[in-house]
Amino acid sequence: MSTQTTEEALKLYFALKKRGVPAELEKFDGYKHIDIAIPEAKINIEVDGKHHNSNNRQALADLKRTYFSFLKGYYTIRIPNSLVYNDYVLNETADFIVGILNESLNKQYGLR
C-alpha cells in the first residue's frame, strides 16, 4: 500500500523536528499509516483535511482508528489543516503539542 504525505503533515512534522521531537513520518502501526508518530510518548498525530469532518463515514472511520490505537496504549491528536497553514499558528500548534508530549512523558515516567 502506497501512502502520500500531505503538505500540511510535512509542515507540522518539520516544526516538531525543529523543536527536538523524535517524530516519525507515516509510521505503519500494523493497521494503518500514522501521519506523525511519537512512539516514545505513545502519541499519534493525524493532520486532517475538511473531508474528515464533513463526511460521516470518514469521521466514523477516524474515530474507530483512534479507538483501536487507544486500546494499544496510544493517544491520537487530531490536528485540522487550518492549524498549519499560517506560520504563526503552526508554531503555536507545535508548541502546544510539545507541551502535551512533555506532560505525557512526565506521567509515563512518574515525574509528577
Task: Cite the ranges covered by each PLM segment.
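Nucleic-acid endo/exonuclease domains
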Residues: M1-R112
